[in-house]
Amino acid sequence: MSSDSRPPQPDTSTQSNSESESPAISSPTPQDHAPMTNRDWWPNQIDVSMLHPHPSQASPLGADFDYPKEFAKLDVDALKADVMSVMTTSQDWWPADYGHYGGLFIRMSWHAAGTYRIQDGRGGGGQGMQRFAPLNSWPDNVSLDKARRLLWPVKQKYGSKISWADLIIFAGNCALDSMGFKTFGFGFGREDVWQPEEVMWGEEDVWLGTDKRYSGKRDLAQPYGATTMGLIYVNPEGPEGKPDPVAAAHDIRETFARMAMNDEETAALIVGGHSFGKTHGAGDADLVGPEPEAAPIEQQGFGWKSSFGSGKGKDAITSGLEVVWTPTPTQWGNGFLELLYGYEWELTKSPAGAWQFTAKDGAGAGTIPDPFGGPGRAPTMLVTDISMREDPIYRRITQRWLEHPEELTEAFAKAWYKLLHRDMGPVSRYLGPWVAEPQLWQDPVPDVDHELVDAKDVAALKSKVLASGLTVAQLVKTAWSAASSFRRTDKRGGANGGRLRLEPQKSWESNEPADLDQVLSVLEGIQQDFNSSAAGGKKISLADLIVLAGSAAVEKAAKDGGHEVSVPFAPGRTDASQENTDVESFAVLEPRADGFRNYVRVGEKAPLEHLLIERAYRLGVTAPEMTVLVGGLRALGANHGGSKHGVFTDNPGVLSNDFFVNLLDMGTEWKASEAAENVYEGCDRSSGQLKWTATANDLVFGSNSVLRALAEVYAQSDAKQKFAEDFAAAWAKVMNNDRFDLE
């Protein structure tokens, strides 16, 4: 949806089920595997490697590199000045439209941040993934390799004090500032990774394909955030290249909502973003060469080399569309809406053959400046721009802004800030002097405004919790319910904020609302007693007490098993209010399944073992940590609803390695249950007597060769103390996942 939001398309009558005649940049040709990989031989095998996405060995900076510490040495004003200078210094190897790279940098930042999707928190600009495949070679990212190369001298100058992830996003913010727009703020703090991460962007095997992500009338499958393989949001020519602005509005609304944007934010981003720069479709896209990942080695990562004319400047081909939205493409103003409503529009084609709109009957001819000093042009718009006028909801919004441009300015500033920062988590993670005040979408939590509990208080509170009548299983499940809502992808959820007691989390089926209410009532009583009697203004938040209670239960269960462990506890969590909790936004954190609790939502069709791996990935735990957590939680009796599946012990509530010992016992033979779906029965191999029941969440630790190797370690006779210690460490990690203040 930004200034070059879709590359030229193939003959989509065969490749995308479209009748579009738009030109195409050829799709990569899949190469035969030699040799075949394990995933080729066994495509349904779970991918345990996804739990180790960014090993420290991959970083040239070393495991001890501290980005916030390095960033603190950065002169951000000097950095901004240098980025501004790059923006207005045109390079012969890729000349700047209108002498200004602002539009290109906005598109680069937008397309980095805009991959974010709310359903699973993946995507976004937080790790600099645009540098790597597939994003660096997506059809929607044509020519963004040039934008990053323009910034290389700046990155080279400031070195590790500024990450690529931050610089890519910051450049777009600087572009707006340089063209007269007052931005809402900016937060640094995105740390680079050093290799691509496998993300399911879609099942289609051709660029610009759509056939495997839709069902029904036009129901976009979860968790996808884009309508089309290789695009950030939607096809700017309309659905499947059919130039229908009303149908395009449906796609726009759906895809932007999946990035957590409402109608006003969506319209603000489109109108605001398209107030700058232009798109590029000067000629035949068949003359454009391969993307960076397929380009010849001598091009050094430069892709899409074009033989149309000079291949750059006035001859540039990026999207195949040739649109300049306003008479002032390097200056903020209300020109986009003034033109959108100031003319009637007729459907035309770009020089590259892509559908777009031009002012009707030659109106406005010559009023739009040429980027390189040529004759003036006629006003033009994308199909998706006309959607802002033809869709009744977008029309009401944009007509109001036409009359009140100051409202557009404010809406765009806030929506742009949200776009750039949506995947960064709480504002406590932001660095730099330009961070705006906390916003509702950042899931704000209050600052600590009281003295924290000390070691003596912690010991006393643990004793009260354990004497409260609540069971080990209840305390463990409650703490797990709070902390396991965290997801590493966009740093949302977790125990901090105490939102387990608020809507929507307190009503989630996975959290067993009736039992949860009972536990919280007891813990709130303990909290109130302590806070009303503690000396020196000490208090404990319910968020802290929930975690402390779970940790006390783990320590007790370990002691009951003959093992002394200490679960680290750091107070400092606070309790958020319902008013500062966006119920609709939090709803996407509700688990479809949680294999750690042996929970699955009714009707879920995906294999449980795959959902377990996905859950572990979002929690940021390694394969060994996932293994020890599942085994320990089963021993503690922490299953959803008190289910006995996977509770391979005669002493539930005691922290032991019984899960692994009994899972790997060859005296047990497993078979699928005839009485219950997704349940397996473990019977004595000799007598046939039923011993245990399990789900795939349990049996995967015996069937998958990698996980079995880990399970064997914890089933060894010398592993009992190690198991208890490893469980305590993994438990503490999950409890502290959202404690960015401890990093």
From Swiss-Prot:
Its cofactor is heme b. It holds the Pfam family peroxidase. SUPFAM superfamilies: Heme-dependent peroxidases. Heme b binds at H274. The active site is at H111. Keywords: Heme, Hydrogen peroxide, Iron, Metal-binding, Oxidoreductase, Peroxidase. GO terms for cellular component: cytosol. It comes from Mycobacterium marinum (strain ATCC BAA-535 / M). Coiled coil: none annotated. Its EC number is 1.11.1.21. Formation of the three residue Trp-Tyr-Met cross-link is important for the catalase, but not the peroxidase activity of the enzyme. GO terms for molecular function: catalase activity; heme binding; metal ion binding. Belongs to the peroxidase family. Peroxidase/catalase subfamily. Residues 1-15 have a biased composition (Polar residues). It is an enzyme of class 1 (oxidoreductase). Gene3D superfamilies: 1.10.520.10, Peroxidase, domain 2. It catalyses: H2O2 + AH2 = A + 2 H2O; 2 H2O2 = O2 + 2 H2O. There is a cross-link at W110-Y233 (Tryptophyl-tyrosyl-methioninium (Trp-Tyr) (with M-259)). This is Catalase-peroxidase. The gene is katG. Residues 16-28 have a biased composition (Low complexity). Residues 1-40, 490-511 are annotated as: Disordered. The record marks R107 as: Transition state stabilizer. There is a cross-link at Y233-M259 (Tryptophyl-tyrosyl-methioninium (Tyr-Met) (with W-110)).
